[in-house]
């Protein structure tokens, strides 16, 4: 590979970043995968697989490992950031002085800025300026299935149509990976954050033993909360019926590959928050997302009762069963009401 002709540089060598890098490389593209831990990158290079997260998926020959950030960023104008939401801004500030003048940035991070609840587009603009094209990909994707080449579909939104077209061409694979373009930059970002919160609630419900009816009701009312918040932020309501909304919500709320769902199940079974996080052993994005989504809802005056009760469990010590009973005890209302 020429030092500057990779199709994509992927920042973040966890399970999802690795899966996306494998998918791009499998499409015939030269891809550079960077991780912050040189020892981890050396292990990936030696094993030619991510043994910790994706042990059965060998790296294509066109996937190149890199531990030097400057070298990784020089390799491609297209940068795909796949890091936890709470370090998203920090990573962007770190890469900004090393990016090529023609750089374009896309992220697969799902969430909002820690503490402030800001959309990641605002974090990116603040860190990188107004001239860099931005994009986001989101949707129902478990890393293990994506890396294995099982059929998967996502949404893609961008501030720049040329960048959106280029990304769709890079990522889309007719055999296994469908990429739907969507002009709703806000909605595609928001869906991925809110679904993490609702998935914790779905897990709690199942952990308590409330059954399939309750889980389905929670998913449906969670979608209503997502849509209300989206409308307040100027998103297109139709987005939440697509991959980045309903698609991701159903996947994360119903399958135990979801860390957020498993975390919620442990809470529903009586485990405390810290012990549940430790047992998961990886980042549970929904834990922080709950606080951030609640902050955003308060800022825009949007009532989100499910999110509020999950917040009470995670941050105020409320019992999961008590939180569920609070929701069940709410006053009767029209299903289509705004609260």
Curated annotation (Swiss-Prot):
Domain of life: Bacteria
Catalytic activity: sn-glycerol 3-phosphate + NAD(+) = dihydroxyacetone phosphate + NADH + H(+); sn-glycerol 3-phosphate + NADP(+) = dihydroxyacetone phosphate + NADPH + H(+)
Gene Ontology cellular-component annotations: cytosol
Record's keyword annotation contains Translocase: no
Location of the active site: 195 (proton acceptor)
Pathway: Membrane lipid metabolism; glycerophospholipid metabolism
Binding site for NADPH: 15-16, 36, 110, 143, 259, 283, 285
Keywords from the named record: Cytoplasm, Lipid biosynthesis, Lipid metabolism, NAD, NADP, Nucleotide-binding, Oxidoreductase, Phospholipid biosynthesis, Phospholipid metabolism
BP terms from Gene Ontology: carbohydrate metabolic process; glycerol-3-phosphate biosynthetic process; glycerol-3-phosphate catabolic process; glycerophospholipid biosynthetic process
EC number(s) stated in the UniProt entry for this protein: 1.1.1.94
Broad class of enzyme this protein falls into: oxidoreductase
NCBIfam families per UniProt: PRK00094.1-1, PRK00094.1-2, PRK00094.1-4
HAMAP family in the cross-refs: NAD_Glyc3P_dehydrog
Function: Catalyzes the reduction of the glycolytic intermediate dihydroxyacetone phosphate (DHAP) to sn-glycerol 3-phosphate (G3P), the key precursor for phospholipid synthesis.
PANTHER family in the record: GLYCEROL-3-PHOSPHATE DEHYDROGENASE, GLYCEROL-3-PHOSPHATE DEHYDROGENASE [NAD(+)] 2, CHLOROPLASTIC
Record-given protein name: Glycerol-3-phosphate dehydrogenase [NAD(P)+]
Organism of origin: Escherichia coli O17:K52:H18 (strain UMN026 / ExPEC)
Protein encoded by which gene: gpsA
């Amino acid at each position: 590979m020429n030092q500057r002709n990779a199709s994509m540089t992927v920042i973040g060598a966890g399970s999802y970043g690795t899966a996306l890098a494998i998918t791009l490389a499998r499409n015939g593209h030269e891809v550079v995968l960077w991780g912050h831990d040189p020892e981890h990158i050396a292990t990936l290079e030696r094993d030619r697989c991510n043994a910790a997260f994706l042990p059965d998926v060998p790296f294509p020959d066109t996937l190149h490992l890199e531990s030097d950030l400057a070298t990784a960023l020089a390799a491609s104008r297209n940068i795909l950031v796949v890091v936890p939401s709470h370090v998203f801004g920090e990573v962007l500030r770190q890469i900004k002085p090393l990016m090529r003048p023609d750089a374009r940035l896309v992220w697969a991070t799902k969430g909002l800025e820690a503490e402030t609840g800001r959309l990641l587009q605002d974090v990116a603009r603040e860190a990188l300026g107004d001239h860099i094209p931005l994009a986001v990909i989101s949707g129902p994707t478990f890393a293990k299935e994506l890396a294995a080449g099982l059929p998967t579909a996502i949404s893609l939104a961008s501030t720049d149509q040329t960048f959106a077209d280029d990304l769709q061409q890079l990522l889309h694979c007719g055999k296994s990976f469908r990429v739907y373009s969507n002009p709703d930059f806000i909605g595609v970002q928001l869906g991925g954050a809110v679904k993490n919160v609702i998935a914790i609630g779905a897990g709690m419900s199942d952990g308590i033993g409330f059954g399939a009816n309750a889980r389905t009701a929670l998913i449906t009312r969670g979608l209503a909360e997502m849509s209300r918040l989206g409308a307040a932020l100027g998103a297109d309501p139709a987005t939440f019926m697509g991959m980045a909304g309903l698609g991701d919500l159903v996947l994360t709320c119903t399958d135990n590959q979801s860390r957020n769902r498993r975390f919620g199940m442990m809470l529903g079974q009586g485990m405390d928050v810290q012990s549940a996080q430790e047992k998961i052993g990886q980042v549970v994005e929904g834990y922080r997302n709950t606080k951030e989504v609640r902050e955003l809802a308060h800022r825009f005056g949007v009532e989100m009762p499910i999110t509020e009760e999950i917040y009470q469990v995670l941050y105020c010590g409320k019992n999961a069963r008590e939180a569920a009973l609070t929701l069940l005890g709410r006053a009767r209302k029209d299903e289509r009401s705004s609260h």
